[in-house]
């Protein structure tokens, strides 16, 4: 039996700002319980809904030194969906109405969390063989584990894994301040350890000190060794390539299931989608005030509205995208210029464009169920979960071939009758427009082929089961 402690800054259902929460909250329940005891540790934010906080059981508390301060550490426990979750409590750091704030506050907050998490292990009654860290917020854990805690008998032989969900976010701050906060001596702040370009870099520390480094798709693991995707750490990724691998994320097939989903008006499955799926489209058209027409080609886009997601390409050809025979439904928030751009087109083509500048889990499910195609022209995408949800709901993804999108969407080949979606290679607006028009042509003029693409997409398995098997192999190799 291998004991694994997965440490992250967020996990569903307690707190979620991005895909990391889905991984930390969903993945652990899919491991083989006879061979792996996987538990999760996150901060006990005061913004976690009360319905969860009131069920947490107090375990213990103690004090740790953080630089020149002594800080309280409370430890709470809760079992959820058969998985044990631990929560590190300290209202000074984890108070407030959102999990993250300004970077200078987060730098200290997650230095505290890293040290507190390791300090809590002996009092949990659970000794992990492997500590699985996620993103820069836990980047100091492998550093502290090797340099500060390894002398203790309890900690000897514990291995660490660092998973990178998005290399863009690295936890970078002033070297002198980080020395003060972490209490680590000068020799750790050299260019082969925590220092990068005259600053301290938490993620770099994690990558250097961890026994294994993973990222969330095989293609992204290769891409981050190149300067374009490497975010100034490509040299380090090449140096660590012998321990670097990629494992694609999954989605929770219980949560995202068109057959049982209570958030959508009409349930359907891989057999009945031809007769039932269009009813969701008409219901959404009615709700959003679009022209009601079950045959109209509807494209969905659920995303953070930022450059990374390829929205500059969309902005460049938006007039052509919103042709007479298309409806375009957008959901998300982000950069003001993109929010306003979509609002403008909603006003200009109000019968065929709907801009919903907010985020709602309910609305996202309705969009996945109603649309014919789903657009994801990302500049880079470590894994991406939206295309997996689209495939699950029989909505055909149109993606750029990068990172996880390339690994999970097989491009349609009309000659071989293969493929689960449409893709384009170069980051170019007209190339994207060309592939959208190609998809539209197949939809309108080759409906049987289109339905076969939907059918193949709904048959693919991107549940957490397949990811969990690969993580089990990784854990066994340590």
UniProtKB/Swiss-Prot annotation:
GO MF, one example: alpha-1,4-glucan glucosyltransferase (ADP-glucose donor) activity
Primary enzyme class: transferase
GO biological process, one term: glycogen biosynthetic process
Record-listed E.C. numbers: 2.4.1.21
Pathway the protein takes part in: Glycan biosynthesis; glycogen biosynthesis
Catalysed reactions, as listed in the record: [(1->4)-alpha-D-glucosyl](n) + ADP-alpha-D-glucose = [(1->4)-alpha-D-glucosyl](n+1) + ADP + H(+)
Binding-site residues, ADP-alpha-D-glucose: 16
Keywords per UniProt: Glycogen biosynthesis, Glycosyltransferase, Transferase
Top-rank lineage group of the source organism: Bacteria
Cross-referenced InterPro entries: Glyco_trans_1, GS/SS, Starch_synth_cat_dom
Transferase found in the keyword field: yes
CDD domains per record: GT5_Glycogen_synthase_DULL1-like
Family, per entry: Belongs to the glycosyltransferase 1 family. Bacterial/plant glycogen synthase subfamily.
UniProt cross-references to HAMAP family, sorted A to Z: Glycogen_synth
Purpose: Synthesizes alpha-1,4-glucan chains using ADP-glucose.
Name recorded for this polypeptide: Glycogen synthase
Gene for this chain: glgA
